[in-house]
């Protein structure tokens, strides 16, 4: 009996020791601090795990005993065998990487994948930079990358421009769920600010129309956001708290997130509050027209134009915002995981600054022009299963519901009638994604997607003197927009030096619209509309890696965008004295893209990446003069306005160059620079051409970073080239309020460069301090196409604690 107990004890001890030995501990080399979020994968397997806040992870989920790969942004990727891991007693150290351009794992195929295997250009943003860079919104987070140009009509906004495209020609993905709706606009789009920058875990920008796994309408690219998630390894209560102040914004920001787990359950909560005052512009150089010398005030029932005591204060830009997020994870078994996520964002009323500064005969036009609260809510239920079957090795199912609400409130000076138009969108989506490894280093990912949008739109006027309410025309027809898609991506290793990747997407879109509510206001040509659009898009690329430090990647791809409700059915004053009307004959547009990506690393000192691309947009949807019932002008909101409609032009084309360089000057000193040049043109009615509106001027960033121990400081420059009058897009020439004038009195957008200094210091293991000076020279500048003048010299300070 004693012998049996002895054997039993030894067996239990060995099993326990084996289980214990499967737990890896990852630390940073210099200070031996634990590293959280390290991704651990096994070669020839798509399964991955992440280290906890204590730098630990359980390796028992890996059945394959191939080499382990440990990767974390900002650190050198480590590959080691299981024998080497055992020899290190399961304690591993990662060395800081001198380079930041590399992204070890990306989600171009909707699954984690090595960036070296992807032929297209992808940029991952380092979350560790969030604390240092002080992005006011997620739009600023993207703009700080040096890869995305951001237009702002108001402080509570930010419309990204990528490779000459913007708005509904770009696609947003939140935790794998499509954010784009049927009313995403063709002009400038502000929805990206609904996402809390402090709740973002990973950000990736997939450039060009080759991102068929996310949507055929991603003409310019896809912005992929992964938000913070619960950590099953964390069984304790922990979190972060942050407060931030900035002078030019009169900002007060507060953020809290915390997580905890118990057994198979884990939870994460996040909340942020942002409050901004009227933005202060710079005082040096600039233009007299940039100053806010007057503003409107309602006094004793009369609109009064008042002198601004501080013309650099952009009266009518203040707003606030709240973001909430809750996630719950249940590890049902070793191979099955269930996740629930809730997101909510709302703003206060957001004054549209570019409209508030419009003048007619030297007098301000609008007494009020606000976006009502921009609300976004998403609920998602995701099921993930890992189990080797003939059809898949991994499977993900996502069910999501999103609610969007937006409104516009406007009133002209001296007119008691206030117009309010409000829209709601209910968006339902299903995604099923499968991953199958084929013959070791080849894999196939495929899936299906179904999306349904229900659009409701209403219009109302209020007489502010007697509060009388009356109906008026709505912005959109009552509509239903559907999308069904099947997509696949195949990645193969053709040789040790060459990899191939190809993808296909079959998409069917349908649109139904009912214009009945607006027929009493405008003689529209139809009372209802119904159409379907079928598309087949794809991409094919090769990664040729002749040397470990050099790769050449050609890629061809196509895109397709069918008209949505905003394109086809909108009634809106798109510019002063103009009105955009529905066009039921509007057809889809087709994109054809070719690009070449080159990566070169010279020793451990220099790293360069260059991308050249060309995109042809056939049957491009552009604004052109039109008529309604034979009339070239109609009365809209009480003003005689010239009629325009979106129509299919013969073509539009974009060509460009993207370049980046990193230079290690010292083990603690790194220089980085990114530069983007793009030119676009579109055909006009008379067969002449005009520069494309969303092809931003050349822009970029350069940065010198010093990082040592618990201290980092960055000196960086951000710059943009001039858009002279003869290169101004025709559409922009109708917006004199937002552009400077040259010596001949013609509109143009001046070049600019600003310098900023930022730093962060780890005061203790639990307290960090960050701060800096933005726009040190206090330059007065307005980025191309923006109504908002950018902030002047801005002092910002952030205090962060963790527990």
Predicted regions and their residues:
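Surface-exposed extracellular loop regions of Gram-negative outer-membrane beta-barrel proteins
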Residues: 348, 403-407, 461, 508-521, ...
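Transmembrane beta-barrel wall of Gram-negative outer-membrane proteins
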Residues: 249-275, 286-349, 375-377, 438-439, ...
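Outer membrane beta-barrel strand-and-loop segments of large Gram-negative receptors
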Residues: 317, 423-434, 483-485, 581-587, ...
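Gram-negative outer-membrane beta-barrel transporters
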Residues: 495-496, 508-509, 613-616, 634-729, ...
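N-terminal periplasmic accessory domains that precede
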Residues: 89-93, 136-141, 158-161, 173, ...
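Flexible loop and strand-edge segments within Gram-negative outer membrane beta-barrel domains
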Residues: 315-321, 331-392, 403-426, 472-478, ...
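Short acidic/polar hinge/loop motifs at secondary-structure boundaries
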Residues: 179-207
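Short, acidic, small-residue-rich periplasmic hinge/interaction motif at the N-terminus
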Residues: 27, 31, 39-43, 71-75, ...
């Amino acid at each position: 009996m004693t012998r049996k107990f002895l054997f039993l004890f030894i067996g239990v001890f060995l099993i326990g020791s084996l289980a214990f030995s499967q737990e890896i501990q990852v630390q940073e080399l210099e200070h031996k601090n634990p590293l959280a979020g390290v991704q651990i994968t096994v070669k020839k397997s798509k399964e991955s795990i992440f280290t906890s806040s204590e730098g630990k992870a359980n390796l028992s989920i890996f059945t394959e005993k191939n080499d382990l790969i440990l990767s974390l942004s900002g650190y050198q990727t480590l590959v080691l065998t299981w024998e080497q891991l055992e020899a290190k007693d399961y304690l591993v150290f990662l060395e800081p990487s001198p380079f930041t351009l590399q992204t070890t794992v990306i989600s171009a195929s909707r699954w984690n994948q090595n960036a070296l295997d992807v032929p297209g250009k992808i940029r991952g943003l380092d979350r560790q930079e969030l604390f240092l860079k002080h992005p006011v919104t997620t739009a600023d987070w993207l703009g700080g990358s040096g890869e995305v140009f951001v237009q702002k009509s108001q402080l509570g906004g930010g419309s990204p421009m990528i490779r000459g495209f913007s708005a509904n020609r770009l696609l947003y993905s939140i935790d794998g769920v499509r954010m784009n709706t049927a009313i995403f606009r063709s002009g400038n789009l502000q929805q990206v600010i609904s996402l809390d920058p402090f709740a973002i875990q990973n950000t990736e920008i997939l450039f060009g129309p080759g991102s068929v796994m996310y949507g055929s309408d991603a003409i310019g690219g896809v912005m992929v956001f992964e938000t913070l998630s619960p950590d099953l390894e964390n069984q304790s209560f922990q979190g972060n708290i942050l407060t931030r102040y900035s002078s030019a914004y009169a900002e007060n920001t507060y953020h809290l997130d915390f997580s905890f787990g118990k057994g198979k359950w884990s939870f994460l909560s996040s909340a942020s509050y942002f409050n901004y005052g009227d933005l202060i512009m710079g005082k040096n150089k600039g233009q007299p027209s940039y100053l806010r010398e007057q503003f409107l005030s309602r006094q004793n029932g009369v609109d009064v134009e008042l002198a601004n005591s501080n013309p650099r204060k952009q009266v009518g830009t203040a707003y606030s915002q709240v973001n909430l997020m809750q996630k719950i994870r249940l590890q049902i078994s070793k191979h099955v995981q269930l996740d629930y996520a809730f997101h909510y964002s709302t703003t206060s009323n957001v004054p549209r600054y570019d409209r508030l500064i419009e003048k007619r005969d030297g007098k301000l036009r609008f007494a009020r022009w606000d976006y009502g609260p921009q609300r976004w809510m998403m609920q998602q239920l995701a099921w993930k299963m890992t189990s080797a079957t003939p059809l898949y090795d991994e499977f993900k199912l996502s069910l999501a519901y999103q609610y969007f609400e937006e409104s516009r409130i406007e009133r002209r000076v001296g007119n008691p009638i206030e117009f309010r138009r409000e829209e709601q969108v209910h968006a339902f989506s299903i995604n099923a994604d499968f991953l199958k490894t084929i013959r070791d280093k080849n894999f196939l990912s495929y899936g299906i997607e179904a999306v349904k949008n229900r659009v409701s739109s209403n219009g109302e006027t209020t007489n502010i003197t007697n509060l009388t309410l009356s109906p008026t025309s709505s912005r959109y027809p009552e509509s239903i927009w559907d999308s069904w898609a099947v997509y696949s991506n195949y990645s193969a290793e053709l040789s040790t030096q060459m990899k191939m990747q190809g993808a296909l997407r079959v998409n069917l879109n349908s649109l139904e619209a009912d214009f009945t509510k607006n027929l009493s206001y405008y003689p529209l040509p139809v009372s209802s509309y119904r159409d379907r659009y079928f598309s087949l898009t794809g991409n094919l690329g090769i990664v040729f890696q002749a040397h470990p430090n050099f790769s050449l990647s050609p890629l061809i791809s196509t895109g397709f965008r069918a008209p949505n409700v905003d394109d086809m059915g909108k009634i809106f004053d798109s510019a002063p004295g103009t009105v955009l009307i529905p066009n039921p004959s509007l057809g889809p547009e087709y994109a054809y893209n070719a690009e070449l990506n080159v990566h070169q690393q010279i020793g451990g000192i220099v790293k360069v990446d260059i991308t050249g691309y060309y995109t042809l947009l056939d049957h491009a949807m552009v604004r052109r003069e039109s008529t309604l019932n034979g009339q070239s002008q109609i009365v809209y909101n009480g003003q005689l306005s010239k009629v325009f409609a979106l129509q299919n032009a013969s073509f539009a084309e974009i060509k460009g160059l993207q370049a980046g360089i990193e230079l290690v000057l010292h083990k603690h000193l790194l220089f980085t620079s990114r530069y983007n040049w793009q030119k676009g043109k579109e055909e006009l009615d008379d067969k002449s051409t005009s520069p494309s509106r969303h092809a931003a001027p050349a822009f970029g960033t350069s940065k010198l970073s010093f990082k040592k121990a618990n201290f980092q400081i960055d000196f960086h420059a951000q710059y943009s080239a001039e858009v002279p009058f003869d290169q101004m897009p025709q559409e922009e020439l109708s917006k004199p309020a937002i552009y400077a004038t040259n010596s001949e009195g013609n509109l143009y957008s001046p070049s600019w460069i600003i310098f900023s200094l930022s730093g962060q210091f780890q005061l203790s293991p639990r307290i960090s301090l960050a701060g800096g000076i933005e726009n040190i020279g206090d330059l007065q500048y307005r980025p191309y196409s923006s109504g908002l003048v950018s902030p002047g010299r801005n002092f910002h300070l952030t205090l962060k604690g963790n527990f």
